[in-house]
Amino acid sequence: TFHLRRGVTFSDGAPFDAEAVRLNMDAIIANRLRHAWLDLINEIERHEVVDSHTWRLVLRHPYYPTLIELGLLRPFRFISPSCFIGGQTRDGVRGLAGTGPWILKEHKENQYALFTANASYWGEKPRLQAVRWKVMPDHQAILLALHKGDVDLVFGADGDMLNLDNFDAIRREGRYAAAISQPIASRAIL
């Protein structure tokens, strides 16, 4: 059973309440095959609105990574009910109004995404007013942009942004803070 924080709104002003959670979970479950890689999807027996700020998730079996998997952006990033098309997401969405500290302001495919601070965010406010995420698929271009000062941050070092050799070289150089986070879950193949 989840007790939702009161006073939280989506960036479009709609309330984040148990009904919004229900709508989002219904859409995720309706698209179950897209998310079959996530075991939690197959463990959901039902979910229900208890009251305006209480939502209950019932699983088929005890499942230890439930809270970890609910924290995954994909597929559990919730959007405002106004973004749904006919109460569904199967055919896309009308917008991307969420409850987080950032609002997607502009997006140019394969170029960049511009995020601005969400003034109505319920938590600690962002220290920056805007962040531009550049798409730079070439490892050498990323490294050059970092050294020239064209980018302030490189996110990801598992081969999708910088290869690990470049990451280790940057860490040894000492000019930049460099860290690798712990994984959120471990799996064993026997």
Model regions and ranges:
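Extracellular/periplasmic solute-recognition and catalytic clefts
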Residues: 46-47, 105-116, 132-190
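Periplasmic solute-binding protein
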Residues: 1-11, 181-190
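Gly/Pro-rich hinge or "lid" segments in bacterial periplasmic/extracellular proteins
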Residues: 52, 62-63, 68-130, 140-141
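Sec-exported extracytoplasmic/periplasmic mature domains
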Residues: 9, 26-33, 64, 120, ...
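N-terminal lobe/hinge region of extracytoplasmic solute-binding protein
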Residues: 1, 26, 33, 95-97
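Alpha-helical secondary-structure segments
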Residues: 17-26, 52-58, 100-101, 128-130, ...
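Solvent-exposed coil/turn segments that connect beta secondary-structure elements
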Residues: 5-7, 21, 26, 52-54, ...
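Surface-exposed binding/hinge segments that line
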Residues: 3, 9, 15, 22, ...
